[in-house]
From Swiss-Prot:
Name the UniProt record assigns to this protein: Sex-determining region Y protein
UniProt-listed InterPro entries: HMG_box_dom, HMG_box_dom_sf, SRY, SRY-related_HMG-box_TF-like
Broad class of the protein's primary localization: nucleus
Organismal lineage: Eukaryota, Metazoa, Chordata, Craniata, Vertebrata
GO MF entries: calmodulin binding; DNA-binding transcription activator activity, RNA polymerase II-specific; RNA polymerase II cis-regulatory region sequence-specific DNA binding
One Pfam family cited in the UniProt record for this chain: HMG_box
One GO CC annotation: nucleus
Subcellular location: Nucleus speckle; Cytoplasm; Nucleus
One BP term from GO: sex differentiation
Length: 229
């Protein structure tokens, strides 16, 4: 017992003989350490691959805006980065050539240093990962084209045939015309029926008034009120 407590280094076989549970814990620690070492190695590789990327030399505007951006950010802490960039672009355009000359000279010096440090440098923009491309919204140009086509769809004709929207409009127009013709037909028939009925009533009254002496001779006590219309 005293030997086990004082020994700092011991083999896994001795641990298994003394306590099987302790051996299981020790083996898990060994595997965890290996995985951690693997992660550290891969992390270093990722960093090394990121360090291989060479940045482009700064131009005159970047040289000027580097210090100016800090001042604007300190003066307006609530201003967004996009608004700061707009303001810097506006201020840069307002500068005269004499005011821009020192920054162009500094940019030329940085370009010469960059060429000496990286003689075979070529600008290679980073490719966007597939995940970022999936997260991005649809292309605005495609959406605008689709909206433009949908707007002009009723006026598009292909191979001498009208589009479906045009055919629908024509069918609705023909349907409305048929309904209008049907309504006018019923109105004319209704008017004719009322005209014929009124004409028949006038004819009946005329015939009764003409035959009134005959009915009066047949029935002497019959009053004229029975034949009033």
């Amino acid at each position: 017992m005293f030997r086990v407590l004082n020994d700092d280094v011991y083999s896994p076989a001795e641990i298994q003989q003394q306590n099987p549970l302790a051996f299981g814990k020790a083996s898990s620690l060994f595997t965890d350490n290996r995985s951690a070492n693997d992660q550290c190695e891969t992390g270093e590789n990722v960093r090394e691959s990121g360090q291989d990327h060479v940045k482009r030399p700064m131009n005159a505007f970047i040289v000027w805006s580097r210090e100016r951006r800090r001042k604007v950010a300190l003066e307006n802490p609530k201003m967004q980065n996009s608004e700061i960039s707009k303001q810097l672009g506006y201020e840069w355009k307002r500068l005269t050539d004499a005011e821009k000359r020192p920054f162009f000279e500094e940019a030329q010096r940085l370009l010469a240093v960059h060429r000496d440090k990286y003689p075979g440098y070529k600008y290679r923009p980073r490719r966007k990962t597939k995940r970022q491309q999936k997260l991005l919204p649809a292309d605005s140009s495609k959406l605008c084209k689709q909206m433009h086509i949908e707007t002009l769809q009723p006026f598009i004709y292909r191979d001498g045939c009208a589009n479906t929207t045009g055919s629908r409009m024509e069918s609705q127009l023909s349907l409305s015309q048929s309904v209008t013709i049907t309504n006018s037909f019923f109105q004319n028939e209704h008017h004719r029926s009322w005209t014929n009925l009124g004409h028949n009533r006038v004819t009946l009254a005329t015939q009764i008034s003409a035959d009134f002496p005959f009915y009066q001779s047949l029935q002497p006590g019959l009053s004229c009120a029975y034949f009033q219309y």
